[in-house]
Design a protein with these regions (language model features):
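GIY-YIG nuclease catalytic motif and its immediate N-terminal context
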Residues: 1-38, 44-47, 51, 55-73, ...
Length: 80
C-alpha cells in the first residue's frame, strides 16, 4: 500500500496551499472539498497540485514534514 504526500491549491485563495499525507488520495480530496477537514474547510474548493507516492510510511511523513518547513515550502514553490 502506498502513502501519498499531496499538495493542494485553493481555488478561492490562490496564495493558500495545503500539504498532507493519505493512503486514499481520491477520498481525501473529496473530504477536503466537502468541507469535512477543519483546517481546509474555509478555502474550498481545492485542486490537487501534485502528489508523490511512497511505499514507506515513515518516508512519507518525513517528506510531508519537510514540505511544511521553511526550506520545504521554498522548494515546493520553486520546483512543484
Amino acid at each position: 500500500m502506498f502513502h501519498y504526500v499531496y499538495i493542494l491549491h485553493s481555488a478561492l485563495d490562490r496564495e493558500r496551499f495545503y500539504v498532507g499525507v493519505t493512503q486514499d488520495l481520491k477520498a481525501r480530496l473529496t473530504k477536503h472539498n466537502a468541507g469535512e477537514v477543519a483546517h481546509t474547510s474555509k478555502f474550498v474548493p481545492w485542486q490537487l497540485k501534485t502528489y508523490l507516492a511512497f511505499s514507506d510510511k515513515e518516508q512519507a511523513f518525513a517528506f510531508e514534514k519537510y514540505l511544511k518547513s521553511p526550506s520545504g515550502r521554498a522548494f515546493s514553490k520553486k520546483r512543484l
